[in-house]
């Protein structure tokens, strides 16, 4: 396949100088395109950009946030750092059992265990991105144990602010009003 230098020589510099300058100004094609700028989309964009990918997020609404903005925002994770000072004994096994019970025993035990094991690390990652939670864990309706982390900001606002900032800081492009 011919390279740019051979094409320039063949066509003559004067006849293609303007198109080459214009081509150089066009943004590179993204490696990753994320559809939706809610919590999951922004998290995917931030992580892909952290790994060096050129990321473009396409959001149909006029602002980021999606359904995460209207969620309760509580985050469940085994968290000895917060639970032990409150006198709460918890474990990955107990969390896994609670997930299976709340799923009416229809949940995949392997996936429940992956969620229970990974929730603590994800909590730390969220906090490293600027997400802030209240200092005590609580038990919420539908939960079986006090392991829920309540955001400092209402609903999902804190998640969106932290993930949106991380995605932008890492170089992701976010486009709203996409049809």
Language-model features: locations:
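Bacterial Sec-dependent signal peptides at the C-terminal "C-region" and cleavage site
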Residues: 15-26
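Aromatic pocket-lining residues of Rossmann-like dinucleotide-binding sites
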Residues: 48
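N-terminal secretory signal peptides and thylakoid transit peptides that target proteins
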Residues: 1-14
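Short beta-strand "acidic-cap" motif of Rossmann-like dinucleotide-binding folds
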Residues: 54-59
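N-terminal Rossmann-fold NAD(P) dinucleotide-binding loop
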Residues: 41
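Conserved N-terminal/central alpha/beta ligand/cofactor-binding core
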Residues: 60-179
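Beta1/beta-strand and adjacent pyrophosphate-binding region of the FAD-binding site
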Residues: 27-38
């Amino acid at each position: 396949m011919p390279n740019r230098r051979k094409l320039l020589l063949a066509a003559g510099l004067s006849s293609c100088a303007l198109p080459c300058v214009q081509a150089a100004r066009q943004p590179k094609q993204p490696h990753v395109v994320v559809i939706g700028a809610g919590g999951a989309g922004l998290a995917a964009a931030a992580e892909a950009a952290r790994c060096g990918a050129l990321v473009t997020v396409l959001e149909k609404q006029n602002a980021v946030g999606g359904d995460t903005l209207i969620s309760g925002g509580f985050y469940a994770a085994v968290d000895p750092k917060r639970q032990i000072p409150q006198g709460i004994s918890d474990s990955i096994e107990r969390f896994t059992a609670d997930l299976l019970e709340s799923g009416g025993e229809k949940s995949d035990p392997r996936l429940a265990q992956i969620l229970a094991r990974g929730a603590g690390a994800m909590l730390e990652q969220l906090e490293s991105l600027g997400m802030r939670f209240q200092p005590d864990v609580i038990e919420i309706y539908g939960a079986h144990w006090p392991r829920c982390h309540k955001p400092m900001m209402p609903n999902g606002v804190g998640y969106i602010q932290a993930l949106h900032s991380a995605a932008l800081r890492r170089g992701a492009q976010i486009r709203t009003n996409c049809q």
